[in-house]
Amino acid sequence: MARPKNVKHIFVTGGVVSSLGKGILSASLGLLLKSRGLRVAIQKYDPYINVDPGTMSPYQHGEVYVTDDGAETDLDLGHYERFLDEPTSQASNLTMGRVYKAVIDKERQGEYLGGTVQVVPHVIDEIKAKMNELAKNANLDVLITEIGGTIGDIESLPFLEAMRQLKLDLGTKNLLNIHLTLVPYIKAACEMKTKPTQHSVKMLLETGIQPDILVCRSEKPLSREIKNKVGHFCNLHEADVIGLSDCETIYGVPIMLLDEQLDKRVLKKLGIKKFQDPELSYWTEFCDKVKHPEDGEVTIAVCGKYTEYPDAYKSILESFVHAGAVNNVKVTVRFIRSEDAEESGCDIATAMKDVHGLLVAPGFGDRGIEGKISFIRYARENNIPFLGICLGMQCATIEFARNVCGLSEANSTEFSKRCRQPVIDLMEHQKKVKEKGGTMRLGSYPCILKEDTIANKAYGKFLINERHRHRYEFNNEYRELLEQNGMLFSGTSPNGDLVEIIEISGHPWFVGVQFHPEYKSRVRSAHPLFVGFVAAAKAFAFGDRQLSFEPDTLPLGEPERTLEG
C-alpha cells in the first residue's frame, strides 16, 4: 500500500472544562487510523512546570505511568498503549518544565550567543523542535499530539503558539487541529446549550488557531440541528462537528467515532488518499464481552492509600476490564482504604464479605501500611486469591515474616529506618542517591520464572520483561528463613539477586510482584497475571476454593522450556 510522504500532524486540544477525555479521544482516533493501515503514534504535552510527574501526589495527578525505557509519564500514555497496542517512550511525554529546563541549560552553555532569552522565539522554537522530534525519528504516517489543560489557561499558551507556527511551516494539509468541547444538557430547560462551545472556540481563535474539527461531548447524542448551529457559529461545516455522547465503557468511544465518520473527515482534510477499510471486529467483540459477560460477576477488593481518587489506580482498573473479558465475567472493584483497618473497631471480615479476591495496590510511605498487612493476613489465612503489586508485595513479605516465621519486628526500612528485622530494604545502588526525581529503579527489566509455579503457568514461559518503579527490595538475608517456612520465590532477576515474584506454598493463588503488571495489559492481550487472578477469583466465587490455575486458561499454549522466552 502506498504511504503518504510526509508525516501528518493532528493536535487535540480541549475547552470549556477539564477531564472531557482528550486522552481517550486521541487514543480512539489513533486506533481508527491504525485500523486503516496507517502507522500512528501519540504523544502528550503537559503545561505544568514539573519536569515529569514522578514526584507529584497521586491526589493531584493520578497514576504515574511508566514506559519501557523508564519514563515517568502522564496516565494518558496508558490509554495510548492500551488502545493502539504500541509502546510509548520518553519522547511521548513533554512537560513545560522540561522545555524551560532545556532552554535554561542552553543559555548556561552559551548557545544563544549572549542574546536575551525569551518565550518567543526561544521557548517556542524548543517546543517546535520537540514536536518534530518523534515524527522524524519514528517510521510514521500520522503523529497525534494531545495538549493538556484547557483553552484559556495561561500555562498552555506556548504550546498553542508553537502549534500555530508549525501549521504555517508545514501547511494546512499537514497539520490539523481537533478541538474537544462540552455541550451541556440543562434539565430545567430540557435543551442542550452550545454557548460554552462557541466561547471556547472564540478563545482558541484569539490565539490565532481555527479548529478544523470540533468533537462535542454531551450526555445525549447531538441532533443535526445542534451540529448545524455549532458549525455555523464556529466557522465549520456541519460534517466537521462530531458528536460524542456518554458511553457505557470508554472502549465504546472508537466505535462511536467511527459511526460519526471522524476518521474519514481527518483523512480527507489531511489529503491521505491511500488507506484500507477499518478492521475492528476484535474490538467490537471485546466491547460485547465487557457489556454482556456470560459468567456473571466477581468482586475484587483493592486495598490502597489513595482510594478516594480512583485515577491513582487507572491501569489496575483497566487491567481488570481486560481480564474480565477474557474470563467472561464483570469485575466489580470494592475500594478499601488501608488506614481503615488501623482504626479501632474495624472488622476486616465484614469489609471482605462477598469479596472473591484481594489486590493490595502500590504506593509510597508508611501511611496505612499496617492496614494493608492486616488485610493480607486475612486473605492468606482464608485462602482468598491475592495479588500484591510493588508495595503490596513488600507488605505481603512483612506479613509472612511476622505471622508465619515469627519475626515479630519484621518491617521495611522505608517505614522504620532502624527496624531490627528489615525484610525489605533500600536497594544497594540507591543508598547514595539524594535526588528524588527520576532516580528510582525505572523501566523494563527481565525476570526468570521458576518452573511449575503460578507465575510460570500464567505466563506460559520462563523469561519475562516487566516495568518497575521502586527503591526498596526484598532483603536476601531473610530469603532462606522465609523459604523454609513456605514462601516460594518464583521470579528473580537473571543473576538471581533480586526477588521479583513471591508465592506461598499451599495457597490456591497468592502472588506478590515487585513490578507493575498493570502497565502492560492491553485490549488484545490482557496481562497474564490479571487473567489468572480474575480466574482464581471466579473459581473462588463459584465455590471451587481449591483452585489450581492452569495455563490453558490463557491462549498461550504450552510453557516454553528455554530462557529465550
Curated annotation (Swiss-Prot):
Q: Where is the active site?
A: 390, 516, 518
Q: Which residues are involved in binding UTP?
A: 18, 193-198, 229
Ranges for the Glutamine amidotransferase type-1 domain? 299-543
Catalytic activity reported:
UTP + L-glutamine + ATP + H2O = CTP + L-glutamate + ADP + phosphate + 2 H(+); L-glutamine + H2O = L-glutamate + NH4(+); UTP + NH4(+) + ATP = CTP + ADP + phosphate + 2 H(+)
Q: Give details on activation and inhibition.
A: Allosterically activated by GTP, when glutamine is the substrate; GTP has no effect on the reaction when ammonia is the substrate. The allosteric effector GTP functions by stabilizing the protein conformation that binds the tetrahedral intermediate(s) formed during glutamine hydrolysis. Inhibited by the product CTP, via allosteric rather than competitive inhibition.
Instruction: List positions binding CTP.
Output: 18, 153-155, 193-198, 229
Keywords, comma-separated and alphabetical: ATP-binding, Glutamine amidotransferase, Ligase, Magnesium, Metal-binding, Nucleotide-binding, Pyrimidine biosynthesis
Q: In which pathway does it act?
A: Pyrimidine metabolism; CTP biosynthesis via de novo pathway; CTP from UDP: step 2/2
EC number, UniProt record: 6.3.4.2
Family membership, please give it.
Belongs to the CTP synthase family.
This chain's protein is named CTP synthase
